[in-house]
Amino acid sequence: TSVDNHGTELTGRGRAQLGVTWNSPLGLGDVFAASGTYAFDPQASRAGALSYSVPLQAVQGLSVLAGANRSELEVDDGILRGFKLKGPASQAYAGADWKFINRPDLQVTSSARYIRESSRFEALGLVLSKQKYDVAEVGASVRHNDARWHGINLAQLSLRQSLRDRSADFDAINPTRDSRFNVVRLGLLRLQYLSRSQRLLFKFNGQYSNNSLPALEQFQVGGNDSVRGYAQGETLGDRGWYGALEYHVDAPGFGDVASPLRGVPWREVLELDVFADQARVFDVDGLEAPADLASVGMGATFRLRQWKNLELRVAAAKPTSALRPGDGRDVRVYARLGLTF
């Protein structure tokens, strides 16, 4: 469970989250997971997700899965009071994962999904956009433990293709979207250990498409998981990339000193970091110039693993690119408090 302020004024700045994972409920090595999010201050939005996976004994490393998620946004406050904006979105999927290489130093997993996704946007009781797509996705992921250079590599590659467009003909929000589309997505991560208490983290995420995409398929930039100097979903596009470089250090100068928290060394309690983010987003139609976003920041993470894995994270980020944040904030502060029972 956790609470944070990672949302926006439109979706609700504060968020309360609860997630449950049930391992082997049927005694088959299966996993059931459920989560819910309620956002508030000043607007209210809700989101929930369910998933279930079960391994197949006939093929080692093969499992089948199914799941669904839904989010609902309602805005009727501030300058938008009276417009009664609503924006539900949902996805349902089924598929399989196959971990066909599973060694201590290397794991490789292939995946396939059939997805039905939909979104709707309403104002004043009128439907402005109603998008429904059937999508197929195939992908592969790799985890490599680099013992020689003391690091960990992660990579993910996926290809998504629309199979069927069941959207309404009228679309006032995204009238140029294509009925057929292909999307390639790539994610890379390198965790490099410099010493027992210092490490570098490099992250990259990118998306490429030659099509004008529906909202649920567009590349999103901004927020705690992207360019942190900007609000969540600051800009969207058909193509884009995001990269970040982070330096982390555990309790610099006093890591081996016993803390007053049951004598746990400070290096297990306090972690400091600095980071730099960079991103660029494009639209295929070329009607708008590419958007460039960049920011720098610092953060601190406080952990008490013996107290229900309590974790408090605080970070601040400042935009360094020419693009002015939509909400006008020059410094953005993120906070999150989480517990695991």
Predicted feature residues:
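Short loop/turn motifs that connect adjacent beta-strands in outer-membrane beta-barrel proteins
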Residues: P25-V31, Q57-S63, I101-V108, N145-L154, ...
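Outer-membrane beta-barrel initiation region
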Residues: T1-V64, N102
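Transmembrane beta-barrel strands of outer-membrane/channel proteins
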Residues: T1-N5, F32-Y38, L50, A66-E72, ...
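Transmembrane beta-barrel domains of bacterial outer-membrane proteins
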Residues: V31-A39, A44-A49, D77, G82, ...
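Outer-membrane beta-barrel domain signature
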Residues: N5-E9, T37-D41, I79-L85, A123-Q131, ...
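C-terminal transmembrane beta-barrel domains of outer membrane proteins
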Residues: A172-F341
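Transmembrane beta-strand segments of outer-membrane beta-barrel domains in Gram-negative
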Residues: L62-A215, V281-V284
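Transmembrane beta-barrel domains of outer membrane proteins
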Residues: D4, T21-N23, S51-P55, G67, ...
